[in-house]
Amino acid sequence: MAHRLQMRLLTWDVKDTLIKLRRPVGEEYASKARAHGVVVEDITVEQAFRQAYRAQSHNFPNYGLSRGLTSRQWWKDVVLHTFRLAGVPDAQAMTPVADQLYEDFSSPFTWQVLEGAEMTLKGCRKRGLKLAVVSNFDRRLEDILTGLGLREHFDFVLTSEAVGCPKPDPRIFREALQRACVEPAVAAHVGDSYLCDYQGSQAVGMHSFLVAGSEPLDSAVRDSVPKEHILPSLSHLLPALDLLEASSPMS
């Protein structure tokens, strides 16, 4: 006899799903540089950051843990590389800026909660769902969530730094399922990355919802994701859960 599916666990991405930076990275970096007497353009720093971040992520994935780095050192190297690419003559002299930026990005004042996030989390709690974070963030995430008033909504928080592997690696999702004592068939993940969040969670048998955000989805992604799995905003999650539970009977 078929029974209605009842979800038990929702895991969440954080950055650009529940929270976002108050100002673009380039603006934050350039502002701190100017405070130390170094004048650089926001857009130049933004472009340099993207290049430096990509290179660092490729050369030292997951904060370089397997190479003996700490996430703090990893980010410091990103900042110094960013300023070198932005044309700062003595980028090594920017070490105090790098240290300050690490602290600033640890502060809830650098971040803001996205519209609908808190209401949606409360709604999920009212349904009796377990909630957890599965994020490719570093060790600062717990403090940021606490400062923003969001930590209390989650049973536990998993970061790729703590677990030792980043999304879409299936091990981080399996760790969440194991901690929650939940089978993947009654768990779903919510995030804004097609590769890391949507495909990563589906690979272990979880359901998945893709947050579309402010930027339009790539047409190839949109064509490959059922429309009922796409959330134009977080306020669409609870109705999407209702539809999922109604349309996925369990034998």
Swiss-Prot record:
Record flagged with keyword Oxidoreductase: no
Gene Ontology cellular component list: mitochondrion; nucleolus
InterPro entries in alphabetical order: HAD-like_hydrolase_domain (IPR051828), HAD-like_sf (IPR036412), HAD-SF_hydro_IA (IPR006439), HAD-SF_hydro_IA_REG-2-like (IPR011949), HAD-SF_hydro_IA_REG-2-like_cap (IPR044924), HAD_sf (IPR023214)
SS bond partners: none
Keyword hit for Ribonucleoprotein: no
Keywords, ordered alphabetically: Acetylation
Modification N6-acetyllysine occurs at: K15, K130
Stored Pfam families: Hydrolase
Positions bearing N6-succinyllysine: K15
Superkingdom of origin: Eukaryota
UniProt similarity note: Belongs to the HAD-like hydrolase superfamily.
NCBIfam families noted in UniProt: DREG-2 (TIGR02252), HAD-SF-IA-v1 (TIGR01549), HAD-SF-IA-v3 (TIGR01509)
Protein name (database record): Haloacid dehalogenase-like hydrolase domain-containing protein 3
Taxonomic lineage of the native organism: Eukaryota, Metazoa, Chordata, Craniata, Vertebrata
